[in-house]
Amino acid sequence: APPPVGDQAGGRKVDCFKYNTTGSAFACTRHERPVCGTDHRTYSNECMFCMLTQNKGFGVRILQDNECDIECTQYSDMCTMEYLPLCGSDGKNYSNKCLFCNAVMGSRGALFLAKHGQCQSP
């Protein structure tokens, strides 16, 4: 099957208005219920996800209701040559986490991890 495109991309949308009760500021609790965004960053809870993604300029969704399998918080433009392959939702193999995270950022959150290891060859 072809990878999802645009609005059909992985993850679920969040109704962030329920957390934005004061009009401009979010009133988030310190309650720990980690969620993983389609930007492959772990947020401490859904409200913090809303607060920190509101100004990203593109729709970050929640990929899963726990910590990310692959964390892209600290990624670099300069990647090493290490080989720890990851399979992206676009069906492409990425040689390592750094290259995968750069592709995630370039896709504006549309790309997500399909599985650890190489994608199956057709």
UniProtKB/Swiss-Prot annotation:
SUPFAM superfamilies on file: Kazal-type serine protease inhibitors
Could you tell me the keywords of this UniProt record?
A: Disulfide bond, Protease inhibitor, Repeat, Secreted, Serine protease inhibitor
Q: Where is this site: Reactive bond 2 for elastase?
A: M81, E82
Q: Where is this site: Reactive bond 1 for trypsin?
A: R30, H31
Q: Which residues form the Kazal-like domain?
A: 10-70, 71-121
Checking Gene3D superfamilies in the record gives: 3.30.60.30
Which Pfam families does this entry report, sorted A to Z? Answer: Kazal_1
Q: Where in the cell is it found?
A: Secreted
Top-rank taxon of the source lineage equals: Eukaryota
Please tell me whether the keyword Secreted is annotated for this protein.
yes
Q: Which InterPro entries match?
A: Bifunctional_prot_inhibitor (IPR051597), Kazal_dom (IPR002350), Kazal_dom_sf (IPR036058), Prot_inh_Kazal-m (IPR001239)
The intrachain disulfides are C16-C50, C28-C47, C36-C68, C72-C101, C79-C98, C87-C119
A single GO molecular-function term is: serine-type endopeptidase inhibitor activity
Q: Name one GO cellular component term.
A: extracellular region
Matching PANTHER family, A to Z?
OVOMUCOID-LIKE-RELATED, SERINE PEPTIDASE INHIBITOR, KAZAL TYPE 2, TANDEM DUPLICATE 1-RELATED
What this protein is reported to do is described as:
This inhibitor is composed of two homologous actively inhibiting halves: one which inhibits trypsin, the other which inhibits elastase.
Q: State the name under which the record lists this protein.
A: Double-headed protease inhibitor, submandibular gland
Question: What organism does the record attribute this protein to?
Answer: Martes martes
